[in-house]
Amino acid sequence: MAIIGLGTDIVEIARIEGVVERSGERLAKRILSELEWEQYQQHEKPVRFLAKRFAVKEAAAKALGTGIRNGLAFNQFEVVNDALGKPILRLYGAAAALAQQLGATSLHVTLADERRYACATVILER
């Protein structure tokens, strides 16, 4: 296997909290998939959840080599967790098409957060 894309993003959680305080749920509705939205509404720490999802979606867009533009949207990336809690990245729409065009056969994602920051790294392999 060869790495064909790598993206990392770090988010200051207080920044996301400020956006949520100013604009309510608009950011969450814009970046989360339907499944993630349901999880966000039930989450014990919704701002932290949102910050981690924002970071992973930015990291994934960077791994694809584009960022969020040229037809890519935040809701085309979705994070689910396996039975052990490991994050799994799913791609839809233009994001999935671009990954296929690049020849990606495997996606790896890791998320981490501390008191002030959330970060994510995404690797695409073929």
Swiss-Prot record:
It holds the Pfam family ACPS. It is an enzyme of class 2 (transferase). Belongs to the P-Pant transferase superfamily. AcpS family. SUPFAM superfamilies: 4'-phosphopantetheinyl transferase (SSF56214). It is found in: Cytoplasm. Mg(2+) binds at residues 9, 58. This is Holo-[acyl-carrier-protein] synthase. One of its GO terms (biological process) is fatty acid biosynthetic process. Disulfide bonds: none annotated. One of its GO terms (cellular component) is cytoplasm. Transfers the 4'-phosphopantetheine moiety from coenzyme A to a Ser of acyl-carrier-protein. It catalyses: apo-[ACP] + CoA = holo-[ACP] + adenosine 3',5'-bisphosphate + H(+). One of its GO terms (molecular function) is holo-[acyl-carrier-protein] synthase activity. Its EC number is 2.7.8.7. Gene3D superfamilies: 4'-phosphopantetheinyl transferase domain. Keywords: Cytoplasm, Fatty acid biosynthesis, Fatty acid metabolism, Lipid biosynthesis, Lipid metabolism, Magnesium, Metal-binding, Transferase. Its cofactor is Mg(2+). Coiled coil: none annotated.
